[in-house]
Amino acid sequence: MKLDDRKQKVLLAIVHDYIATAEPVGSRTIAKKYKLGVSPATIRNEMADLEEMGYIEQPHTSAGRIPSERGYRYYVDYLMKRQELSREEEELIRREYEAKVRDVGQVIQKTGQLLSQLTNYTAVVLSPQIESSRFKYIQLVSMHPSQAMVIVVMDNGIVHNRMIEVPESITCADMETISRVLNAKLRGLTMESIRLTLMKEIYFELARHKHILDLAMELIQDSLLHKVEDKIYLGGVFNMLNQPEFHDVEKVKTLLGILEQEKLLRDLITSGGSEEGVTVRIGGEIMHEDIRECSMVTAPYSVCGRKIGSLGVLGPTRMEYAKVVSVVDFMTKNLSQVLERIVRGTGR
């Protein structure tokens, strides 16, 4: 239900003041600070209506009011005006990304650090997802008579290096043959699509090279089909402890316990979000009882128009949504651009 203009102004004042001070807000405070052009008595009446409608609530120990989850949701959906990044903040992001522009892992790690630095909350970044990435090429490099390095490169810039044992009878020419066949058959395919049928094709392609067939099959199984979990990068873990909501020891223990659970964090950052753009989930919308007092702002990042990972910010429900949404949006777009440059090999 859409609120009338005066109720919107009162709700906006309560949200802004509570975000800034972490103190319940009274009618006199609103009348003095926000110049709404009405008396404290009128503001009290509007606050009573807002409370009855579920947009604000009264803490047990205070005469003031604070926004409810419903109030925050109304604010984010209808009242919030984004707080754009300063020129200095935008330049900081671009400068830091340019310094790490050739290494995907470092770029993702730096993203977590920047998100937490710019928001003063906890950042969660999911690395590019292996299962949805596409195979670019594989190369076998002889290191010793019985050892070789396998280099697997994905189209999102991820590079896997592994040392493997090889029979001494395998020559550099054999390794080139394996690399050539695998590259011809696998290039452009996702990890999900490299399955049994394709392995049969490769088997028949290399059947005349009996001495290298087993090695090729082993490479596909171990280097390409091996399940690799997407990494979670955290930034500013202890930022949340500076928030008044988390001065309670038990709440701190619960929060830190959650931040240690990678599977849970992976679910939190990937579930409930849109395929593009920024998603804001408030309190109970996160669907996890232990962090009902938190909100999460998330967005996917992409390469060449394909979603490959997600990033987000975890903070109290009293978070600065206007700033956080802008930071997440700006960084998502810049991260996508940087990863595309890495994939294309164009550097800066």
UniProtKB/Swiss-Prot annotation:
Family matches, as Gene3D superfamilies: 3.30.450.40, Heat-inducible transcription repressor hrca homolog, domain 3 (3.30.390.60), Winged helix-like DNA-binding domain superfamily/Winged helix DNA-binding domain (1.10.10.10)
GO terms under biological process: negative regulation of DNA-templated transcription
Could you tell me the keywords of this UniProt record? Repressor, Stress response, Transcription, Transcription regulation
Q: Does the keyword Repressor apply?
A: yes
Q: Which GO terms describe its molecular function?
A: DNA binding
KW Cytoplasm (keyword) present = no
Residue ranges spanning the membrane: these are none
Family the UniProt entry places it in = Belongs to the HrcA family.
Say what the protein does: Negative regulator of class I heat shock genes (grpE-dnaK-dnaJ and groELS operons). Prevents heat-shock induction of these operons.
What PANTHER family does UniProt report for this protein, alphabetically? HEAT-INDUCIBLE TRANSCRIPTION REPRESSOR HRCA (PTHR34824:SF1)
The molecule here is called Heat-inducible transcription repressor HrcA
Species for this entry: Pelotomaculum thermopropionicum (strain DSM 13744 / JCM 10971 / SI)
